[in-house]
């Protein structure tokens, strides 16, 4: 299974939506809180090409974007292959 990482903040509704989609598909993911900034937030910004908003979602170290990007992948039928649910 691919490694899925999602950078989040506690009171972010977009983060909740992205996590809910992944959970509905039974996908295990590592959630990394950036509520308080610091090293984790800096790492997220560096990995995401300077983007500072959350969520920031990575699948196997590839930045796929935020919540809207994840939803578009789902709508376009591409997400399942990326997260290892199809061959």
Q: What do the PLM-derived regions correspond to, one by one?
A:
Residues 1-30:
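Local sequence-structure signature of Cys/Sec-based thiol-disulfide redox active-site neighborhoods
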Residues 59-86:
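Non-catalytic, surface beta->alpha helical segment in thiol-disulfide oxidoreductase systems
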Residues 5, 31, 40, 74:
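Acidic-residue sensor for enzyme active/binding pockets
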Residues 1-3, 84-87:
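Compositionally biased, disordered extreme N-termini, encompassing classical targeting presequences
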Residues 7, 35, 62:
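Anionic group-transfer/hydrolysis microenvironments
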Residues 34-52, 78, 82-85:
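Thioredoxin-like thiol-disulfide oxidoreductase module
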Residues 18, 40, 53-54, 63-66, ...:
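Amphipathic alpha-helical interface surfaces
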Residues 49-58, 68:
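Structural micro-motif
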């Amino acid at each position: 299974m691919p490694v899925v990482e999602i950078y989040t903040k506690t009171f972010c509704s977009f983060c909740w939506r992205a996590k809910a989609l992944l959970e509905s598909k039974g996908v295990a993911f590592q959630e990394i809180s950036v509520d308080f900034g610091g090293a984790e937030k800096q790492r997220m910004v560096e990995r995401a090409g300077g983007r500072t908003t959350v969520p920031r979602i990575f699948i196997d170290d590839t930045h796929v974007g935020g919540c809207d990007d994840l939803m578009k992948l789902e709508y376009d039928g591409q997400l399942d292959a990326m997260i290892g649910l199809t061959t």
